[in-house]
Amino acid sequence: MADFLGMMKQAAQLQSKMQEMQDALGNVEVEGISGGGLVVVRMTAKMDVKGVKIDPSLMKAEEREVLEDLLVTALGDARRKAEAAVQEKMQSLTGGLGLPPGLFGQ
């Protein structure tokens, strides 16, 4: 019975910490970069895009396809970095709770 109560207490702690982490992820920002910095996308770890910077040299009509490709690449780079930030936060959150490895994608 004591084990069950301990597990319930851990579950409540985890739920509280998960909510704190979700709130904190909105403040974690990453940058996705492509074309050696010609395109930079800023987003939060919650995947909200906060800004896009485009080098003026890409603003020509003949560079449209290059710009489109660089935007896709920069967004993908930012998404990967945001996912890594989430993983890092999740590992720090669940590390001391004695949960089985891989339970939350660790």
UniProtKB/Swiss-Prot annotation:
Entry GO terms, CC: bacterial nucleoid; cytosol
Keywords for the protein's UniProt record, in alphabetical order: Cytoplasm, DNA-binding
Organism of this sequence: Bradyrhizobium diazoefficiens (strain JCM 10833 / BCRC 13528 / IAM 13628 / NBRC 14792 / USDA 110)
Subcellular location: Cytoplasm, Nucleoid
Domain of life: Bacteria
Record protein name field: Nucleoid-associated protein bll8115
Quaternary context: Homodimer.
GO molecular function: DNA binding
UniProt similarity note: Belongs to the YbaB/EbfC family.
